[in-house]
Regions:
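H-loop/switch region of ABC-family ATPase nucleotide-binding domains
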Residues: 80-81
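ABC ATPase nucleotide-binding domains
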Residues: 112-113, 117-136
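Conserved ABC ATPase "signature" region
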Residues: 1-16
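Catalytic Walker B motif of ABC-type/P-loop ATPase nucleotide-binding domains
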Residues: 45-48
């Protein structure tokens, strides 16, 4: 019980400890799921689209929490598809299209060639026209 309360405190959800899970918002629910992993003393967190369906405030809270956990030595793997936020959110990225296209830092991986290989010619053309991403 102490571990659970400590984990809820870390994610800012202690005030909601007596609420039923169905009463939580999307962002609150994501933080509870992270607390669950922390209570199990997980060294790795695997998160599938943790920012889907939540508001900007919750997203900011969660990304700050994840950065704090990273700084504490936790390893975090996140599935994420919003290319506009990749540079500010992640240290390293993997581009996958049925197989690994590229892995490395954002600046190493976010190239027009890699993006074209991962997402097809349409995004490659968009990038070359200067639309929408910070791809080199």
């Amino acid at each position: 019980k102490d571990l659970a309360l400590k984990a809820l405190e870390k994610v800012g959800m202690v005030a909601f400890k007596d609420r039923h899970i169905s009463e939580l918002s999307g962002g609150q629910l994501q933080r509870v799921f992270i607390a669950r992993a922390l209570a199990q003393e997980a060294e790795w967190l695997l998160l599938d689209e943790p920012f889907a369906g939540i508001d900007a405030t919750s997203e900011k809270i969660i990304i700050e929490l994840l950065k704090q956990l990273r700084d504490e030595g936790k390893s975090i793997v996140i599935v994420h598809h919003d290319l506009h936020k990749v540079q500010s959110y992640f240290d390293d990225i993997v581009l996958i299209n049925k197989e690994v296209v590229a892995f490395g830092t954002v600046s190493e991986v976010f190239t027009a060639n890699n993006m074209g290989r991962a997402y097809g010619e349409a995004i490659s053309e968009m990038i070359s026209l200067g639309g929408g991403t910070n791809v080199k």
